[in-house]
Amino acid sequence: ELDGWQTLMEQHYLDMQALGQTLLQAITVALGIERDFFDKRFIEPVSVLRFIHYPPRHTATSAEQQGAGAHTDYGCITLLHQDSAGGLQVRDVRGQWIDAPPIEGTFVVNIGDMMARWSNDRYVSTPHRVISPLGVDRYSMPFFVEPNPDTRIECLPGCQSESQPALYPATTCAEFLLSRFADTYAYRREPQAS
């Protein structure tokens, strides 16, 4: 055990949650809703901090070897701190994969599926993937900003109209996350052929 590690990570978690709250306030301003809308929905958040290691590719011809296949994140927003190895790609509005190179002192901010539901796709989830770097280990520290488990996820005020009705049924944070996990890991429940 590293001396002071737990204290350091607990503080980092709190700092990341505070940064997430600041970004969520900016979203409320952009959407024209009450500025403290998210505050009461993030009193006991289920946000997650992960540490991810991506092993290196060993040959230039294994470019299709991915550290993480194309996906969107489940929650509200994701704050990603990358190391200098690179490998993160995002899909642009034309469907092209573009590099999201690490920039020292910055975070990548991805919109997640829960925010897309809340905003009725005014904010859309960010499709992304990781291509393992050639000959270099890659490390990242994503922070998944998630509300209280019982928070109702439904179309925000002003994000729907007669001509643009709500695209998604109402749910709760817990119900939505559990359904996404169940879909993602369905293969683990399927009987294995012998």
What is each residue range found by the language model?
Residues 1:
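Redox-cofactor-proximal catalytic regions of oxidoreductases
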Residues 4-194:
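C-terminal flanking tails of non-heme Fe-dependent oxygenases
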